[in-house]
Amino acid sequence: MVLPKDVKWDLIRQFQRHEQDTGSPEVQIAILTERINRLTEHMKKHKKDIHSRRGLIAMVNKRRKLLEYLRETDYAKYLEVVQKLNLKVK
C-alpha cells in the first residue's frame, strides 16, 4: 500500500537525523510501520487477499532486519524508535 505524501513526509520529518535525511534506518522503520499498520487493517477486511498478505510478511521481515541493524549500530536510537512507534520487541 502506498502512503499519502503528507503522511510520509510527516514521518520523515519526525524521525530524520538531519534536514536532507530521507533514508536512515529510523525513517525507513517509521514508514514501514505505518504501511504495515494500514495493510493490517486491510487484511482484517479482506482475509483471502493472499498477494497483500505476502507483501505484509515481506514488509514485517524488512522492518525486523532494519531494527536489528539499528540495535547493533545505535542502541539508544533503537530504544527511542521502538518507544515512539510503540513496537513490541523481544
From Swiss-Prot:
GO cellular component: cytosolic small ribosomal subunit
One Pfam family it belongs to: Ribosomal_S15
Domain of life: Bacteria
Keywords: Ribonucleoprotein, Ribosomal protein, RNA-binding, rRNA-binding
InterPro entries: Ribosomal_uS15, Ribosomal_uS15_bac-type, uS15_NS1_RNA-bd_sf
GO MF terms, alphabetically ordered: rRNA binding; structural constituent of ribosome
GO BP: translation
Function text: One of the primary rRNA binding proteins, it binds directly to 16S rRNA where it helps nucleate assembly of the platform of the 30S subunit by binding and bridging several RNA helices of the 16S rRNA.
Subunit structure: Part of the 30S ribosomal subunit. Forms a bridge to the 50S subunit in the 70S ribosome, contacting the 23S rRNA.
Name of this protein: Small ribosomal subunit protein uS15
Lineage: Bacteria, Pseudomonadati, Aquificota, Aquificia, Aquificales
